[in-house]
């Protein structure tokens, strides 16, 4: 269950490994929309993305025994680097399963944080299934990229920073892949100020959250086609869906 106490704990914990990402006013977007538009530059984090937040908080909630067993995850990029970086900070071993088509630069960056990288399968789903197999065979602790409420709580620390810096915020727009980010951000935003509108932005060619909301449950798409590979998820997390149903006001397809 996601609680304000856990969000506050996560927000303090992730400060140890995140860079301050102050809101940046966009004159161009503000002119185009007729509103005051600010950007949250999470690309300025150590690993180049917000994923370090969820990975670090999740690993921080684990017992010493769970960490000592070694961590494992599957990812084609940002979550891989987030888990690798966080595992290094906690002094534990991490194994990252990545698709064989993962760009070499992402593989090398993940390795640079001390993780063991295993290349398997052509797509994320292949890598994920193999990671689950390795976790079962070796007793590793799995750190899911999005279908985990502790991971989502860590990502939600973004909302804490937005509201603290801009208390008058009316709308928060959040990209959707598997649903972890928008689960955390929307839930905390509504806790802090129920008047805030949270709008999801999802690829039209990988609209797995839209499909889940229509069906009332997580469903698997036949394919996920989008240039935004970080949001190319065929099935959203079933743990995330109830929070999205309750806290997200609308989803835009692009």
Model-derived features: where do they sit?
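PLP-dependent amino-acid enzyme catalytic core
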Residues: 1-254
């Amino acid at each position: 269950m996601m609680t304000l106490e856990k969000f506050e704990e996560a927000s303090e914990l992730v400060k140890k490994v995140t860079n301050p990402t102050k809101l940046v006013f966009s004159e161009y977007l503000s002119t185009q929309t007729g509103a005051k538009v600010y950007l949250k530059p999470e690309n300025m984090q150590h690993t180049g993305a917000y994923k370090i937040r969820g990975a670090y908080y999740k690993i921080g909630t684990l017992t010493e025994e769970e960490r000592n067993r070694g961590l494992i995850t599957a990812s084609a990029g940002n979550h891989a680097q987030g888990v690798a970086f966080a595992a290094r900070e906690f002094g534990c071993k991490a194994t990252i399963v990545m698709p064989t088509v993962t760009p070499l630069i992402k593989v090398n960056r993940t390795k640079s944080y001390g993780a063991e990288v295993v290349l398997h399968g052509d797509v994320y789903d292949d890598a994920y299934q193999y990671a689950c197999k390795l976790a079962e065979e070796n007793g590793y602790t799995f750190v899911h990229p999005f279908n985990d409420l502790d991971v989502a709580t860590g990502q939600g620390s973004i909302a804490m920073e937005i509201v603290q810096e801009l208390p008058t915020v009316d709308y928060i727009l959040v990209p959707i892949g598997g649903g972890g980010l928008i689960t955390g951000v929307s839930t905390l935003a509504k806790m802090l100020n129920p008047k805030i509108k949270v709008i999801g932005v999802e690829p039209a060619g990988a609209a797995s959250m839209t499909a889940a909301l229509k069906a009332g449950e997580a469903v698997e798409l036949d394919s996920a086609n989008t240039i935004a590979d970080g949001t190319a998820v065929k099935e959203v997390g079933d743990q995330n869906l109830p929070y999205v149903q309750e806290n997200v006001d609308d989803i835009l397809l692009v």
